[in-house]
Amino acid sequence: MRTAISKNENIKGAMQAKSNAAHGLRDLFENGLKDIYWSEKVLTKTLPNMVKNASTPELVNSLKSQLNESKEHVSRLEKIFQENGMKPTAKKCDAMEGILKEADGLIKETDLGAVRDAGIIAAEQKVKHYEIATYGTLHAFAKTLGENKAANLLAMTLDEKKKTDATLTGIAMSTINNQAHKADAITNIKA
């Protein structure tokens, strides 16, 4: 019984790989690093807009903290690239670009206040969940490849992303979601 398909075998319905396709776990690891590196660098440019558009001090402080963390995460990724003899290179992440485009649209489509804050939290949690998935995968790849320094740095970042996600949930559930819900009631009274 065959369990693997050689790369030269034709499979009905299978996509033809690009010439620079990943051929092994190390290639996937390196591509993933480039992808999340792009994402973190873009976040350092987009988080200030979220800070500017948030109104709740607790959310503003959380977003500022996330900005500082993203800068630290960029540095960690650069260390991982260097440890692996690679030049730090960003590869556009279509998924993160889409999430951030959605976040920008959400900000433009909401009034400043609790409703916008709830939207910013929702958007930022989508970012965090993508990052958690990516860093978790990269951590597993690094461990499998025996890249222990990289695995440790990725685990640190993964833990921070999970804590940030929990913080955002706490902010949303403690006040912002209820305040945004009250805005619904006021809108319904006016209608």
Residue positions per predicted region:
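Amphipathic alpha-helical hairpins
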Residues: R2-A191
